[in-house]
């Protein structure tokens, strides 16, 4: 059949076409399982602007299976390589230069790229055998091919998009950081976790009393979400009953947090100096004109600071240097946004442009600060992962 590539001559032809650029879609053993718990069944490759794609079987009964390293050689020789989810691709092939078109779409359109790979045959098999780990081995390879063709037709226009500022930071640095962060998983007490969190099917992302998470990077501010198998790991309830479901795979869980993080990040942007003491307490001492701050005063100061950053600066304190600088910074950002049509976030260079809906100065500063927080944390995580590479301590979860 023309679309199945098995012979060396066809593989060599595909390798020659790689100089035109390739789109790749990996078919895993089960679409519902975490990619770390799945294997590679086949690979769909489509030369850019070709009228059809090709499917190369790796572990499917209907094909003369091709070694993965042979396919890696073809993909790595592409002048440009596009995929719908680079982080998932990394579980099958270490292709650092791949361009994530879902990320590209989210950075250009400020929205999520929607696509479906369903067809009647896939629906039939998944309705009956969804829990079977190797379900995609059972589905006729022609139907797997059809589903990949369907996805390509829905996303092909994104390949033509111009790469925006900041794309490499998220496509390479962020994608690698969160891919590596997913490798450890979080230790759990299996029965307690299953009872409290009711995952759709625990088999989809649990192994050896460890649950695997999955970060989604395709958000307006680039703040990652982290939900998989009906469990939101970015918003684990703080009740003792929920927290007791987790166990360290080593000796202890250690939680690290930043003091007055957004306040400090914004102070850096406006060149306002805060000491190493509690950021909120430093301003509380000014508000209440005293050196010793009680708990209620601290909470009030924290609320005031939050409103000053993301809402309206209280008139009572508008004269303070930090707030005059914040006001000037917000006005400057908004002026650049209005005049130039976009502003670039610090560190990542991510653009916030006219494609955003219902923008105003407060919304813009909110987006910029969330982006700054995320990009700074990505760099911190990158260094932490590098430091812990040969250590027993593992990073297991990122929240904000």
Language model features with spans:
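Helical mechanochemical/support elements of P-loop NTPase systems and associated helical scaffolds
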Residues: 144-147, 173, 373-376, 380
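Conserved RNase H-like, two-metal-ion catalytic cores of nucleic-acid enzymes
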Residues: 1-119
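Helical catalytic core of nucleic-acid polymerases
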Residues: 90-163, 174-184, 229, 235-361
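Acidic, glycine-rich two-metal-ion catalytic cores of nucleic acid-processing enzymes
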Residues: 32-40, 45-51, 58-63, 190-295, ...
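Acidic two-metal-ion nuclease catalytic site recognized across multiple nuclease folds
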Residues: 167-176, 196
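Short Gly/Ser/Thr- and Asp/Glu-enriched loop/turn motifs at secondary-structure junctions
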Residues: 100, 172, 192, 300-302, ...
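Non-catalytic, peripheral interaction segments enriched in hydrophobic/basic residues
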Residues: 169, 181, 185-190
